[in-house]
Amino acid sequence: GGFGALEFKAILGDECPVIVQTNNLPYDTRLNGPASVYCSGKSPVSVALFPADADKSVLDDIMDISPYDKVYQDVLECDLSLVNPSVHSGPCVINFGAIEQQDLRGKFCMYEHFTFGAAKIDWAIDAERKAVGAAFGYQLTPLEDFCEPKGDLHWQDIYQKMHGAPELTPI
């Protein structure tokens, strides 16, 4: 995700190979020391091919290596479906002070500081992202896919997911 396929194309030009891009990072991790990472879980991912009309048989090989949930129309839809920008932004904005404190550097645990206000910011950011996606003809559901609400997504669903997912709360 994160527009990586488009960046590769910009750099490599016509020599750019077929790229299978994901909408999320496959592992839930936290840096816990120099050259050391704690992995608390595996996240489901969905994929898109670049170029969009590439031979889809490459997806069979990918499924053997790392299973995926669905295939997007193209990498723009995939990129706009990356959940991290709308999950991390709220708590980071609300907690700038704690994040910037030198004695907390590297020790800030986002999920411990995920407040009602952070969830409300994330919900608003997601609404803006969906509006951008709709302008391109996409019906984006990244936070719905992530939070699995019983009905329409509300900020409370985001808050509950961030505090109730065993794979996330340790990081």
Predicted regions and their residues:
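Residue-identity detector for glutamine
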Residues: 21, 73, 101-102, 139, ...
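A broad structural signal for alpha-helix termini and local helix breaks/kinks
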Residues: 12, 66, 133-136
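Short, mixed-charge, low-aromatic patches
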Residues: 13-22, 79-88, 146-152
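Rossmann-like NAD(P)(H) cofactor-binding subdomain of soluble oxidoreductases
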Residues: 1-32
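Short, surface-exposed acidic
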Residues: 16-19, 68-74, 137-146
